[in-house]
Amino acid sequence: MTFSVDIFSRFIDNYGDISIPLRLAKGLYIEHGVSSNVFLTINKLSQQILEKNLFNENINIFDIDKMDNNFIPNTNVVTIFDTQLPACYEALLSHKNLLINYEYFSAEQWVDGYHLKESINKKYKKIFYIPGVSENSGAPVFSLNDMGLICNEKRKDKIQINFFCYFNENIDASIKVLNTNFPQIDILQHDRFDKNKNRTNNLLSFNDFDIALSASLINFVRGEDSLIRAILAGSPFIWQPYIQDNNLHIEKLNAFLDHYFTSLPPQLREIFLLWSNQGLNLEHWQYLLGNIENLKYFYLEARDKFIKRGTGIGQIYSLFIK
């Protein structure tokens, strides 16, 4: 079935704001032949991200803040993280339109009761798509054909650790302990910036970032899209959720640890929690590096269970063709 979809997302400070809609558009075309109009916040950083990633003529990129008032909506629409539609666009929607709102990833139990629920909106049909880890939640946006999945095993044995995180003094101190005691390990810090540095200096394309994760011994990742990429890479990872008030991100982290892994060694749970709250000392690095082979099998087992549920690209497409 051939059709097009309109995808909306505002890029604020989270790479998922731009990577998720673009990965969705790419996957819909490659796997199902669906072309997309992707409406994004266009600024200096998003422009540089777009330049790093090549898209064919079946993915059209538009500035969400400069929408043509005469643009005719497609029947199928996706908003990422409940992006507010331009008023001129929303005014043209009717009961013939299906809007899928792709929500934030969560492993919390409430997701099961809200995934695929319809909004009370009377003008057009709106469905809440909530990605998570349970059977009753949605699958996140990813493709089994992503390049990060096809790196060979030799690359995974490279002594390299990736850090894509919300840097702070505790994390800086943790990395210093690692560097001092394990100088043979290459440390890669992604999106490391401050007031005097250009954030775009170390940007990678989506494919190159996926490959970097697959080639790494351990990955420290942040936010949503990078968590999914780390899961697919198959290497051990430590996740740092987006930091929220009242330690709500710790509740989100605990829910993920409880439901994603079949059984979690207490030392590993402690490392996850410390990474989001405090930092790691020599004892924690010794545990991770000293048990790396056992941890690899542990993470691969969890990944294989995770991807058996299907992909968000396939599930969203299925909703469109119902």
Model-based region annotation:
Residues 262-322:
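C-terminal amphipathic helix plus adjacent low-complexity
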Residues 236-279:
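Nucleotide-sugar donor-binding patch of glycosyltransferase catalytic domains
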Residues 19, 168-176:
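A conserved mid-protein helix/loop that constitutes part of the nucleotide-sugar donor-binding site
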